Amino acid sequence: MIQGLLFDFFGTLVIYDERRVHQRFPRTHQQLADHGVRLDEQALIRGIDQVFTRFELDARDSMLEFSMADIFTVVLNNLEVDPLTVDLEQLAHCYTQEWSADIKPIKHVQTLLRQLQREYQLGLITNTHFAPMITRLLKKFELES
């Protein structure tokens, strides 16, 4: 007898665009400009995307996930900014807020989960690179229980 159901967050509970260069990141750009980065926003975002792509390819081979702190440590080193001088947690919050701005819950997902919760234990899995983003989105979409 089935007692529980697991859901993957991205692509199952929400609709999202996994690309990282299709929208603007003005606050992320400003935070890095405040630390002396003199790239325009698009060049900066392309640089972040290149680091992400490299980490994703490495993760496919190693089966080890990475964090936003890992990404921004490499990005900052590439930009010759000491990562120890930057609040990586705040930078990750800023970047993931901008990246996730267009994420939407699938239609009627709240109702579906409430109905399923009456009979099953529900669980969530995700391989996110920044757990606070998932917590924030669950709250925003009223998917917490």
Language-model segment annotations:
Residues M1-I2, E119:
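A short, charged/proline- and glycine-enriched loop
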Residues I2, L143-S145:
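Local beta-strand N-terminus motif with an aromatic residue
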Residues I2-P105, A131:
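N-terminal helical cap/lid subdomain that shapes the substrate entry/recognition surface
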Residues G36, E80, E119-Y120, E142:
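Glycine-centered loop/turn motif at secondary-structure junctions
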Residues L88-P105, V109-F141:
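Substrate-recognition element of Asp-dependent hydrolases with the DxDx(T/V) motif
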